[in-house]
């Protein structure tokens, strides 16, 4: 007897007439008047459950099988046969059923076999992966992460693990979570009455990282092509469908590369992972198209087959000002593009992914390379139809004097960035990179409108349950 995942049986990788055991949970049980029960058994290995046909001659049919409800865990042994019913090619003619775990009170089981609102599912995040929606999201999240790793590996990049605890504010925005072991009821103070962080665990102020970029740059200046992929944190009090306090970021860094190199990498990477999603998760994508967003599959296919439009920020502003459409947020040179501006450019004007380059320096971070005009920096955003910004990046400032000037302009203490400045002192090179918010990528591929529903246990303002 062999044990097989449901996906192997449904996809014909287990021979017809062979005996096999599957382990999983009951999605539904249906009883016929002829004394036969049909169990839909799922194990999470694919979207569809496996139908197990159970005759009433099994010794535990009356006492156990007829009491199985949604969520019960079972081990089903039987013979693989061609299915006569619609919806699956194969089913299991059960010869033995072992009940592993019952649902204590089926009437109060939070995941009863009915549709639940997405808001309700967030309240039971420990059980929501049992639903069709969140299970499909979890598999897609895995597929996209694996595709990203595969893409970078195949293209000669090294994965670098950057620290989650840091002293550097990469974005210079100050929206950071503090890490401390000090007694909040008895804080040590300096002579000036300020908190004495010298007595803290790290002997200084420390925070959860907002980006692995600065550390990634250090390794790019030794290994040439690297990427970081891990959790990042923003203490931003935003209750929107696009923001999380804890989320995952993918950040490649390329030495000897300019802004155009970063744009090319972004295009190749996105098309690679979207192809992987279509090839590897067809069943889940079909569900998303039927239940979440009817355009998910066609949107991905169109994205893959589109050439990215390339435009300067200044030209983008001119397009928005002259398009004749009214926006909630005003459009003028120097403003950061809002989501409605981004989506107009990608969905209406170009009807394709857009790379917007060379933004005003005053709305971008200190590390972005100053352009010759003295007003803009070599920054880029990739705008995708259906979501707006999906990637943000730049060519990094490799000139020490220009970096110091930007730090001073933004009121940042250059001594706090001493090691980052060292990279410019010892064999500096032009280098570029970008950041991809992983949850936004998952949301884009699945059509799920809120990023809280594409991460297992969302962390948002006033919510850190589970």
From Swiss-Prot:
The keyword Cytoplasm applies. GO terms for cellular component: cytoplasm. Its EC number is 6.1.1.22. It catalyses: tRNA(Asn) + L-asparagine + ATP = L-asparaginyl-tRNA(Asn) + AMP + diphosphate + H(+). Keywords: Aminoacyl-tRNA synthetase, ATP-binding, Cytoplasm, Ligase, Nucleotide-binding, Protein biosynthesis. GO terms for biological process: asparaginyl-tRNA aminoacylation. Its main location: cytoplasm. Disulfide bonds: none annotated. It is found in: Cytoplasm. One of its GO terms (molecular function) is nucleic acid binding. It is an enzyme of class 6 (ligase). Belongs to the class-II aminoacyl-tRNA synthetase family. Homodimer. This is Asparagine--tRNA ligase. It comes from Photorhabdus laumondii subsp. laumondii (strain DSM 15139 / CIP 105565 / TT01).
């Amino acid at each position: 007897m062999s044990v097989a995942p449901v996906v192997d049986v449904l996809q014909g990788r287990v021979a017809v007439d062979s005996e096999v055991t599957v382990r999983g949970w009951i999605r539904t049980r249906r009883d016929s008047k002829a004394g036969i029960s049909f169990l839909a058994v799922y194990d999470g290995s694919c979207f569809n459950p496996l139908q197990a046909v159970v005759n009433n001659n099994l010794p535990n049919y009356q006492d156990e099988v007829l009491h199985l409800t949604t969520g019960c865990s079972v081990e089903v042994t039987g013979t693989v046969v061609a299915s006569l019913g619609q919806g699956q090619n194969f089913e299991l003619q059960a010869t033995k059923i072992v009940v592993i775990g019952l649902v204590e009170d089926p009437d109060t089981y939070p995941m009863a076999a009915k549709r639940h609102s997405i808001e309700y599912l967030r309240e039971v995040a420990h059980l929501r992966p049992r639903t069709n929606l969140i299970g499909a999201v979890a598999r897609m999240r895995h597929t996209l992460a694996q595709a990203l790793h595969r893409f970078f590996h195949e293209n000669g990049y090294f994965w670098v693990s950057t620290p989650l605890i840091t002293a550097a504010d990469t974005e210079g925005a100050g929206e950071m979570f503090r890490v401390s072991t000090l007694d909040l009821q008895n804080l040590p103070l300096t002579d000036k009455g300020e908190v004495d962080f010298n007595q803290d665990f790290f002997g200084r102020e420390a925070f959860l990282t907002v980006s692995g970029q600065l550390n990634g740059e250090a390794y790019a200046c030794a290994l040439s092509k690297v990427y970081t992929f891990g959790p990042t944190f923003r203490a931003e009090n935003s209750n929107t469908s696009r923001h999380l306090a804890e989320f995952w970021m993918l950040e490649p860094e390329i030495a000897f590369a300019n802004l155009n190199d970063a744009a090319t990498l972004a295009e190749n990477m996105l098309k690679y992972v979207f192809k992987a999603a279509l090839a590897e998760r067809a069943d889940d994508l079909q569900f998303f198209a039927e239940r979440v967003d009817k355009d998910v599959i066609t949107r991905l296919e169109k994205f893959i087959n589109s050439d990215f439009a390339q435009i300067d920020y200044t030209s983008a502003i001119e397009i928005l000002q002259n398009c004749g459409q009214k926006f909630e947020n005003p459009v003028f040179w120097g403003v950061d593009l809002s989501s409605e501006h981004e989506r107009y450019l990608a969905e209406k004007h170009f009807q394709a992914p857009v790379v917007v380059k060379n933004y005003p320096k005053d709305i971008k971070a200190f590390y972005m390379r100053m352009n010759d005009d003295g007003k803009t920096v070599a920054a880029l955003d990739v705008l995708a139809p259906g979501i707006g910004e999906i990637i943000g990046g730049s060519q990094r400032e490799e000139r020490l004097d220009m970096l110091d000037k930007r730090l001073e302009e933004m009121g940042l203490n250059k001594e706090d960035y001493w090691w980052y400045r060292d990279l410019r002192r010892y064999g500096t090179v032009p280098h570029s990179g970008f950041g991809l918010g992983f949850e936004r990528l998952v949301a884009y591929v699945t059509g799920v409108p809120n990023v809280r529903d594409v991460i297992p246990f969302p962390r948002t303002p006033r919510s850190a349950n589970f």
